[in-house]
Amino acid sequence: MARYRHSRSRSRSXYRRRXRRRSRYRSRRRRYRGRRRRRSRRGRRRGYSRRRYSRRRRRRY
């Protein structure tokens, strides 16, 4: 009974956590990777440069 209970709870928790962890990690990884890569490469360089240049040009010119 003890072994069966332990293995059953382990498999259930595990399964639930994997699942959950896999789905959450996949969604979070895809979102974080997309946001980080887009923001760090395109967002920071193009976004920040465009915003800063547009603000400077609008203010100066």
UniProtKB/Swiss-Prot annotation:
Tissue expression notes: Testis.
Keyword field: Chromosome, Developmental protein, Differentiation, DNA condensation, DNA-binding, Nucleosome core, Nucleus, Spermatogenesis
Entry keyword DNA-binding: yes
Region named Disordered: 1-61
Subcellular location: Nucleus; Chromosome
PROSITE patterns the record matches: PROTAMINE_P1
Source taxon at top rank: Eukaryota
Primary localization class, coarse: nucleus
One GO term of the biological process aspect: sperm DNA condensation
Entries under InterPro entries matching the protein: Protamine_P1
A molecular-function term among this protein's GO annotations: DNA binding
GO CC term (a single one): nucleus
Family under the similarity heading: Belongs to the protamine P1 family.
Cited function: Protamines substitute for histones in the chromatin of sperm during the haploid phase of spermatogenesis. They compact sperm DNA into a highly condensed, stable and inactive complex.
UniProt protein name: Sperm protamine P1
Provenance organism: Onychogalea fraenata
Organism lineage string: Eukaryota, Metazoa, Chordata, Craniata, Vertebrata
